[in-house]
Amino acid sequence: MKLEIINSQIEAGQKGLQIFKQAIQQGAQVFGLATGSTPISIYDAITQSDLDFTKFISINLDEYKGLANNHPESYHYFMNKYFFSKKPFAHSYMPNGLADDLKSETKHYDQIIEENPIDLQILGIGRNGHIGFNEPGTSFNSQTHIVNLTDNTIQANSRFFDSIDQVPKQAVSMGIASIMKSKEILIAAYGKEKAQAVKEFIEGPVTEDVPASILQKHPKVTVILDQAAAALLSKK
């Protein structure tokens, strides 16, 4: 696990861009993408660069159940706003949260991942150590699955909605085993509210109580942290 401690979001974006460039130089063609505030600075740097993704494939981590693709809080909308409208891919895959049969959708999505192994996966981490929508207690062997969001995650996401009642209670998420198949992983965290989760996933035991802790077992992980998120680490 390689740690990169940065002083600003702009610096984080440049670090992320550098990792994308290196991956492409090494032959990467399939990129696993994430949503939320954490990757925005990286996406900003990428979309302002000269990188061309028109021959590549993107596969997103997750999507809420029940939100239309054009809903401002859907992850389809997010990705179009921050990435795809500026840097399109040959194919962009995202879970279909509107599917009539979500169970079939999860199997279909696993097939997509199987046919398009991810070269570089972007991740954020939740305050409780979740990655994607894989909440504490999720099996490390999990594939793409339907998730019942925890009260903490619903509360954290409520800032994006007019009221907490509008926050979706379920999502479709790539599983932890699916994520771990990626050849390379870039995970980022910023702010003091992430410091405890960062300490636990980097220095704590590998446990399903902290889903991100499984990344200790992955052969190629880069962690981008600001000073606040890294504050509780004993080794930096």
Swiss-Prot record:
Top-rank taxon, per record: Bacteria
Pfam families reported for this sequence: Glucosamine_iso
UniProt signal peptide: none
Keyword list, A-Z: Carbohydrate metabolism, Hydrolase
Reactions catalysed: alpha-D-glucosamine 6-phosphate + H2O = beta-D-fructose 6-phosphate + NH4(+)
Any single GO CC term annotated in Swiss-Prot or TrEMBL for this entry: cytoplasm
Gene Ontology BP, a term: N-acetylglucosamine catabolic process
Pathway entry: Amino-sugar metabolism; N-acetylneuraminate degradation; D-fructose 6-phosphate from N-acetylneuraminate: step 5/5
EC number: 3.5.99.6
Active-site residues per Swiss-Prot or TrEMBL entry: 62, 128, 130, 135
Known function: Catalyzes the reversible isomerization-deamination of glucosamine 6-phosphate (GlcN6P) to form fructose 6-phosphate (Fru6P) and ammonium ion.
Protein name from the UniProt record: Glucosamine-6-phosphate deaminase
Organism: Oenococcus oeni (strain ATCC BAA-331 / PSU-1)
Lineage: Bacteria, Bacillati, Bacillota, Bacilli, Lactobacillales
